[in-house]
Amino acid sequence: MATEAAERMRKSKIICIDIETTGIDRNNDEILQVSIINGRGKTLYNSYIKPDYTTEWKETEVINKISWDCVKFAPGILTEKRKIDKILRKAGLIIGYNHKGFDLPFLAAKGIDTAVKAQIYDVMLEFSYIAVDYDEKHGNYKWKPLTYCAKYYGYTDYKAHDALEDVRATLYCYYAMQKDRKGRAAARRRKRENNE
């Protein structure tokens, strides 16, 4: 299991990644920011990314506060590909919040090599079993936003929707979950029950 292996892994081999984008469609929207820290919280990579085609994203700008002025002189994603690929290749464990379903596929769609040997730990998916909000309609536990998870574990003083702030909050939540034996035991039990 990724959790048990991660507990033994050196913090320098653990990375936490987050991106901000112009929208949620990985085939048509573009990346605006990529942030990666290691398991000690050291920033390995943090940069705005200049979109190749888009100069306006009003709906998501309201959320992430990233405007054209923030990114117009930033490097493009393909310019930064080698740096990001190198960090991902060296990782033993890649942590994120909804990165299994969003960040990693989005990066892959833009040419970043996410097919690495590292284990993947999605804090959002694991936390859904701890948060205990069952969705009868879909027959599964509801996914909660990072702000909810962070608040649950007492991490409240951060600016959500900035990739660097989000990776710091995610890493904090990851370590809090590792220490939350009662929550993890309940999560394992709920997973088994849900898969029966």
Regions found by a protein language model. Name each.
Residues M1-R8, K151-Y152, L164, R168-E196:
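Acidic two-metal-ion nuclease catalytic site recognized across multiple nuclease folds
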Residues A2-G111, A115-K117, W143-Y155, H161:
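Conserved non-catalytic scaffold segment of RNase H-like nuclease domains
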Residues T114-Q119, K182-R184:
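P-loop/Walker A phosphate-binding loop and immediately adjacent motor/lid segment at beta-alpha junctions
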Residues Y121-Y141:
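Short alpha-helix plus adjacent loop in nuclease-associated cores
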